[in-house]
Amino acid sequence: MLWFKNLLIYRLNREIPLVAQEMESQLSAMAFTPCGSQDMSRTGWVPPLGGGSDALTHCANGQILLCARKEEKILPAPVLKQALQAKIERLEGEQHRKLKKTEKDALKDEVLHSLLPRAFSRFNQTWLWIDSVNNLIMLDAASAKRAEDVLALLRKSLGSLPVVPLTLDKPIEMTLTEWVRSGNTPAGFCLQDEAELKAILEEGGVIRCKQQALVCDEIAVHIEAGKLVTKLALDWHERIQLVLADDGAIKRLKFSETLRDQNEDIDREDAALRFDADFALMTGELAVLIDELITALGGETAQ
């Protein structure tokens, strides 16, 4: 199983039935199919277990895992430009006149479609985890754009998906700044050696610290000058390390070897059983982490 590296968290703002068995037929209508000869991109659902199963959902203890795959055709701009220029020059030579802009635009589309069947494809996969117990949806996505694209696919598949980004009662950067300023963190959380500080005013600059003790005079001076901590590396119970950003995004998740080794007694040859155990272990840990982190940051904004 691919352990999550990032977490973008969304709140279901009203209850809707999210049951794996019922979702199967809804998701199958949007199952992934490869790009046709004239498609620039395609996105759809694939089995989380890969070739080991045809099921588009994987469920354990009220947690549902989905996987979206996207195929994009890669057409380097210089290749398109060169082919277009060659066609323009040939036509202008044959017709003994300069082509109009509208004609060149039409030619560009024509050249694009002629090149598409020969273009290489780039694939990416995005994992989506539905915590039906706590009414949360988490995505292993490094950008909000990718997360929103996958949520849009899920919304289209289900017909409705009332979700909003998780919002907290207090600005995250204010809380992170206080943790670094005082050196005091809530129980279970420890400061690591990496942070980013930004000035409130845009022209005030950005400070990025790596492999540096954060509770020190140097950092204190920046905070006193008005900079706020916008990214902070944390350790949680010596089980998970992460970088928390001021928009609530959790990046660079790293699970301890002690945690990951808890399922080593399960035979790796039984891929489905190991996948199920790792998924249950990962989501169980992350659900507690998310709950404790929300509390540590001052709680959610009332819906």
UniProtKB/Swiss-Prot annotation:
BP-aspect Gene Ontology terms: DNA recombination; regulation of DNA recombination
Pfam families noted in UniProt: RdgC (PF04381)
InterPro entries registered for this protein in UniProt: RdgC
Chief location category: cytoplasm
Subcellular location: Cytoplasm, Nucleoid
GO-annotated molecular function: double-stranded DNA binding
A GO term from the CC aspect: cytoplasm
Keywords: Cytoplasm, DNA recombination
Stated role: May be involved in recombination.
HAMAP family per the UniProt record, alphabetical: RdgC (MF_00194)
PANTHER family recorded: RECOMBINATION-ASSOCIATED PROTEIN RDGC
Family that this chain belongs to: Belongs to the RdgC family.
Protein name per its UniProtKB record: Recombination-associated protein RdgC
Organism: Edwardsiella ictaluri (strain 93-146)
